[in-house]
C-alpha cells in the first residue's frame, strides 16, 4: 500500500498544474475602487492646494502690495459660477477642471522661468505649488479613468508665453496667476463636494 501511495505522489508531482489551482494572472490585480473614496481624495488634494495658494497669494500681497485687479489674457476664464452649481455634471466638471489646472500649471512653470530677481525669494513656494498642481492633475486623470468617464481631448500645443515686459510685469503676472488659481480651486472644491452627493 505504501508503494502505491508513493507511486501516486510521484506521478502527481510530474503534473502540478493538474492538482494545484491556478493562481491569479500575472500583473497587479485590478481592485475595484469606490468612486466616492476617489472623489474624497481629489477633494482633499484640491483643498490642500487651495490653502497653499491662499497662503502664497498673501505672501505676494505682503511683499509686493498691488491694488486693483490683475489680469493675464492667457489665463483661463472661470467657467462656473454659484448659479450653475445645480446643473453640474461630473464628466464636464472633471474635464474642464483638468484643462484649466493644466493651464495654471504651465503658467506657474513660466513664472518660475521668466520671473526676475524680485520673485526669486518665492522660488521654493512656487516650486512646491507646481509639484502639488502636478499631483492633483494626476489624481483627476486617475479619477476619470476609475469612473470610466470620457477622457479629455489631447492637450492642444500651448501658446508660448513671452517674458514679462518688466519686473513690475512679472509681479502683476504672479498676482494674476495666484488670484485666478485661487478662484478656480475654490469653485472646484464646491463643485466636487456637490457632485459627490450624486454618486
Curated annotation (Swiss-Prot):
<comment type="similarity">
    <text>Belongs to the IL-6 superfamily.</text>
</comment>
<feature type="region of interest" description="Important for interaction with IL11RA and for the stimulation of cell proliferation">
    <location>
        <begin position="182"/>
        <end position="190"/>
    </location>
</feature>
<dbReference type="GO" id="GO:0008283">
    <property type="term" value="P:cell population proliferation"/>
</dbReference>
<dbReference type="GO" id="GO:0038154">
    <property type="term" value="P:interleukin-11-mediated signaling pathway"/>
</dbReference>
<dbReference type="GO" id="GO:0045944">
    <property type="term" value="P:positive regulation of transcription by RNA polymerase II"/>
</dbReference>
<keyword id="KW-0732">Signal</keyword>
<dbReference type="GO" id="GO:0005737">
    <property type="term" value="C:cytoplasm"/>
</dbReference>
<dbReference type="GO" id="GO:0008284">
    <property type="term" value="P:positive regulation of cell population proliferation"/>
</dbReference>
<dbReference type="InterPro" id="IPR009079">
    <property type="entry name" value="4_helix_cytokine-like_core"/>
</dbReference>
<dbReference type="Pfam" id="PF07400">
    <property type="entry name" value="IL11"/>
</dbReference>
<dbReference type="InterPro" id="IPR020438">
    <property type="entry name" value="IL-11"/>
</dbReference>
<dbReference type="GO" id="GO:0005142">
    <property type="term" value="F:interleukin-11 receptor binding"/>
</dbReference>
<dbReference type="GO" id="GO:0005615">
    <property type="term" value="C:extracellular space"/>
</dbReference>
<dbReference type="InterPro" id="IPR020412">
    <property type="entry name" value="IL-11_mml"/>
</dbReference>
<keyword id="KW-0339">Growth factor</keyword>
<comment type="subunit">
    <text>Interacts with IL11RA to associate with IL6ST, giving rise to a multimeric signaling complex.</text>
</comment>
<keyword id="KW-0964">Secreted</keyword>
<dbReference type="GO" id="GO:0043410">
    <property type="term" value="P:positive regulation of MAPK cascade"/>
</dbReference>
<dbReference type="GO" id="GO:0046888">
    <property type="term" value="P:negative regulation of hormone secretion"/>
</dbReference>
<keyword id="KW-0202">Cytokine</keyword>
<dbReference type="GO" id="GO:0008083">
    <property type="term" value="F:growth factor activity"/>
</dbReference>
<protein>
    <recommendedName>
        <fullName>Interleukin-11</fullName>
    </recommendedName>
</protein>
<feature type="signal peptide">
    <location>
        <begin position="1"/>
        <end position="21"/>
    </location>
</feature>
<dbReference type="GO" id="GO:0005125">
    <property type="term" value="F:cytokine activity"/>
</dbReference>
<comment type="function">
    <text>Cytokine that stimulates the proliferation of hematopoietic stem cells and megakaryocyte progenitor cells and induces megakaryocyte maturation resulting in increased platelet production. Also promotes the proliferation of hepatocytes in response to liver damage. Binding to its receptor formed by IL6ST and IL11RA activates a signaling cascade that promotes cell proliferation. Signaling leads to the activation of intracellular protein kinases and the phosphorylation of STAT3.</text>
</comment>
<feature type="site" description="Important for interaction with IL6ST and for the stimulation of cell proliferation">
    <location>
        <position position="168"/>
    </location>
</feature>
Amino acid at each position: 500500500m505504501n508503494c502505491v501511495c508513493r507511486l501516486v505522489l510521484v506521478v502527481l508531482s510530474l503534473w502540478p498544474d493538474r492538482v494545484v489551482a491556478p493562481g491569479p494572472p500575472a500583473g497587479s490585480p485590478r481592485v475595484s475602487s469606490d468612486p466616492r473614496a476617489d472623489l474624497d481624495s481629489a477633494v482633499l488634494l484640491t483643498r490642500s492646494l487651495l490653502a497653499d495658494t491662499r497662503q502664497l497669494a498673501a505672501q505676494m500681497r505682503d511683499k509686493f502690495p498691488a491694488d486693483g485687479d490683475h489680469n493675464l489674457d492667457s489665463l483661463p476664464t472661470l467657467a462656473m459660477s454659484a448659479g450653475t452649481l445645480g446643473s453640474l455634471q461630473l464628466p464636464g466638471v472633471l474635464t474642464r477642471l483638468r484643462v484649466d489646472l493644466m493651464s495654471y500649471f504651465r503658467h506657474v512653470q513660466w513664472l518660475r522661468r521668466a520671473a526676475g530677481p524680485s520673485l526669486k525669494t518665492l522660488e521654493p513656494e512656487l516650486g512646491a505649488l507646481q509639484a502639488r498642481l502636478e499631483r492633483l492633475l494626476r489624481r483627476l486623470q486617475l479619477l476619470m479613468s476609475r469612473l470610466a468617464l470620457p477622457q479629455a481631448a489631447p492637450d492642444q500645443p500651448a501658446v508660448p508665453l513671452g517674458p514679462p515686459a518688466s519686473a513690475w510685469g512679472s509681479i502683476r503676472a504672479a498676482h494674476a496667476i495666484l488670484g485666478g488659481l485661487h478662484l478656480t480651486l475654490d469653485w472646484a472644491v464646491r463643485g466636487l463636494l456637490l457632485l459627490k452627493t450624486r454618486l
